[in-house]
Amino acid sequence: MSLLNVNTIEPSTGTGVTLGASGDTITIPSGATIANSGTATGFGGITAASQWRMTTTFEGDAAPIASNWEVSDSTAYASLGSAMTESSGIFTFPSTGFWFVRFTGMIKTDNGADRAAYNIYATTNNSSYVQVTESQVFGANTGGSNTYASVSSEAIVDVTDTANVKVQFHVMQENNSNDTMGSSSYPQTGVTFIRLGDT
């Protein structure tokens, strides 16, 4: 093995320097430190994150929640990387990878002790959706007054093909007069998407 001692590597022409060839492994020894003052790309990691919310309150079941979604614009909020897209309640991922998905639902019961299920459904063929989580919330009876409660449901989705792997979000109410809460000011019922890394 040859040893090359240098303090600075600069390109002889242009602005790029290539280390090795495709398929090679570049090894950084244990205890070594990479000091980066610029922008590092191609290392995977968290490259995309966004939050969506449902803007309008509705009664009863929804399979899926097909309308009134928007990207959050609350104070200090910002999306990272490429954006998710939504059409009729179907969410499309902007890139392949392992994605963390959290669905939070808020219930308002009218006058009693009722439960609701807020579940994530996924497809791998852009057609048949399968339930992948089950989370239930219970609005306790408080003497006939309205009760509010929230629950979250989480999944890690392996998006191998953005054209076919998609998600949607369902709610099933025990009492169809109960509400799923929505707001255009902050997420009451909403979804968080975080890309964890490469598939």
Where in this protein do the model-derived segments appear?
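Terminal (often C-terminal
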Residues: 34-114, 124, 135-136, 177-199
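Short, surface-exposed tryptophan/glycine-enriched loops
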Residues: 142-166
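Solvent-exposed serine/threonine-rich low-complexity stretches and specific carbohydrate-binding patches
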Residues: 131-143
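Beta-strand signatures of extracellular beta-sandwich domains
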Residues: 117-121, 168
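Extracellular beta-strand solenoids
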Residues: 6, 11, 19, 28, ...
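Short, intrinsically disordered N-terminal pre-domain segments
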Residues: 1-16, 197-199
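Short beta-strand-plus-loop segments that form exposed binding edges in beta-rich domains
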Residues: 170-176
